[in-house]
């Protein structure tokens, strides 16, 4: 049977808690975490499947799935009369009284979905990675190879081996897996590049009957964690029936040379932050603006973003940033940041190298640097976030080892004291980094810009003093 005649069912594993992304996952499943101003993490997996031509998709959910289920129902509506659907399927205890015990058990408990649709091929993908991929190319290789299971693979730095499934390729057949170990303490590097190893992307293609058989075998075992990477893939490797798909071979329309093999696991706060910073350069490491392979999401009903002068005639600006619908920058300065829908940045404030989610409000003269603020956080005037790790920790904010400060959804920011006001005032001085770079070779323009900045800061200070007097 040719690929065009094969029936394909896609299963998205979206039940993970995402403990390493806390506090962003305190009230939502990891695939529902907002990303890049207006998306949810799951939008990347679903967009890739839809763009690949796969329009029968089930999403297996479990942990705090309300916002995820709502997003899927409001965003991913298809014509069910034509046999197309994206269906959110929660844990239902169809097999015994337990909830999903692992990724493999999630599919095992949902085998009725496979039996009902009777596909030839099952594509299984994770819901929390940022990338573009044409799965039809992977399916085509899978069918041609005769393998019963195929794993998508990407090269990663050797020091990250303990975070991924590690693939060893058969020396006589580069499309066959010789060994697969889930998250080993260490692993040898590739022969072609000893600094890298071949990591599983968590994306799989199976012959449907072979997958069903493997899941039944796994369910009967006592020595299993019911995990796709830890148990099901090794089962096929032991049988000599597991293939590997090299992600670098995947060809995406409209991709740039820089982002064509981009894949980011955003399972930690630091990697989540870094993925945002990958978006904002003029030639980004990952290009959101590829209209030939769009990433779909629910369209905001908010009005366009607006940049206006503040009450003290300070100019609202955003440099090297992504700004979503409904954002108002009223006399503040935004640099190297991502602002989600309906965020507000007041006069004299500065947001630098940060991620602000929906409806975050930044008060006058506040400074935010290298921080992630979840929805509905209100930052009072003159506050300093991300400038002093000890101060941030004392106020109950999460601070990562690399120095990223994270505020949870709706977290209360206390009014700043004198020391904090002085700290934020110190960091408001001077030109934005982007302006410094742009005027590096023109001292006259740099001097003029510095005078304007000094004037703005003086007016902000005067306004703050007047407010304190009253």
From Swiss-Prot:
The answer on whether this UniProt entry bears the keyword Nucleotide-binding reads: yes
CDD domains attached here? ADP_Glucose_PP, LbH_G1P_AT_C
- List the GO molecular function terms: ATP binding; glucose-1-phosphate adenylyltransferase activity
The record's PROSITE patterns line, in alphabetical order, gives:
ADP_GLC_PYROPHOSPH_2, ADP_GLC_PYROPHOSPH_3
- Superkingdom of origin organism: Bacteria
**A biological process from GO:** glycogen biosynthetic process
Positions annotated to bind alpha-D-glucose 1-phosphate? 165, 182-183, 200
Query: Which UniProt keyword terms apply here?
Result: ATP-binding, Carbohydrate metabolism, Glycogen biosynthesis, Glycogen metabolism, Nucleotide-binding, Nucleotidyltransferase, Transferase
Q: Which pathway does the record list?
A: Glycan biosynthesis; glycogen biosynthesis
Question: What does the record give as the reaction this protein catalyses?
Answer: alpha-D-glucose 1-phosphate + ATP + H(+) = ADP-alpha-D-glucose + diphosphate
Quaternary structure and interacting proteins, as annotated: Homotetramer.
Name the family: Belongs to the bacterial/plant glucose-1-phosphate adenylyltransferase family.
Q: NCBIfam families, from UniProt? A: glgC, PRK00725.1, PRK00844.1
Protein name as catalogued? Glucose-1-phosphate adenylyltransferase
């Amino acid at each position: 049977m040719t690929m065009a005649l094969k029936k394909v069912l896609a299963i998205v594993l979206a039940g993970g808690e995402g403990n390493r992304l806390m506090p962003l996952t305190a009230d939502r499943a990891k695939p529902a975490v907002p990303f890049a101003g207006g998306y949810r993490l799951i939008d990347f997996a679903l967009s890739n499947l839809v763009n690949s031509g796969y329009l029968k998709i089930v999403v297996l959910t479990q942990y705090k799935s309300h916002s995820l289920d709502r997003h899927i129902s409001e965003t991913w509506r298809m014509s069910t009369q034509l046999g197309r659907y994206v269906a959110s399927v929660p844990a239902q205890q169809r097999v015994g009284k337990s909830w999903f015990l692992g990724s493999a058990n999630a599919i095992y408990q949902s085998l009725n979905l496979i039996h009902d649709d009777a596909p030839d091929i099952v594509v299984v993908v994770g819901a929390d990675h940022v990338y573009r991929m044409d799965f039809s190319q992977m399916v085509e290789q899978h069918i041609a190879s005769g393998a019963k299971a195929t794993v998508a693979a990407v090269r990663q730095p050797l020091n990250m081996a303990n975070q991924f499934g590690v693939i060893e390729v058969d020396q006589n057949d580069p499309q066959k897996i010789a060994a697969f170990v889930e998250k080993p303490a260490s692993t040898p590097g590739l022969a072609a590049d000893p600094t890298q190893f071949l990591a599983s992307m968590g994306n799989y293609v199976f012959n449907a009957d072979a997958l069903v058989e493997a899941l039944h075998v796994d369910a009967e075992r006592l020595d299993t964690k019911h995990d796709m990477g830890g148990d099901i893939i090794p089962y096929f490797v032991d049988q000599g029936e597991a293939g590997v798909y090299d992600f670098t071979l995947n060809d995406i329309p409209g991709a740039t040379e820089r982002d064509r093999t981009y894949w980011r696991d955003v399972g930690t706060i630091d990697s989540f932050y870094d993925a945002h910073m990958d978006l904002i350069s003029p030639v980004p490491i990952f290009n959101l603006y590829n209209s030939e392979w769009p990433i779909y999401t629910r369209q905001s009903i908010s009005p366009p973003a607006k940049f206006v002068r503040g009450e003290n005639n300070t100019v609202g600006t955003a440099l090297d940033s992504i700004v979503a619908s409904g954002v108002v920058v009223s006399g503040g300065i935004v640099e190297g940041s991502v602002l989600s829908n309906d965020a507000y940045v007041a006069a004299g404030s500065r947001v630098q190298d940060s991620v602000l989610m929906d409806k975050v409000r930044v008060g006058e003269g506040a400074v935010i640097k290298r921080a992630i603020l979840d929805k509905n956080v209100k930052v009072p005037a003159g506050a300093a976030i991300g400038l002093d790790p000890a101060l941030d920790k004392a106020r109950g904010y999460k601070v990562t080892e690399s120095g990223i400060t994270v505020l949870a959804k709706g977290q209360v920011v206390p009014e700043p004291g004198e020391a904090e006001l002085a700290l934020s005032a110190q960091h408001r001085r001077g030109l934005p980094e982007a302006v410094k770079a742009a005027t590096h070779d023109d001292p006259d323009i740099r001097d003029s810009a510095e005078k304007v900045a000094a004037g703005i800061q003086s007016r902000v200070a005067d306004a703050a003093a007047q407010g304190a007097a009253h």
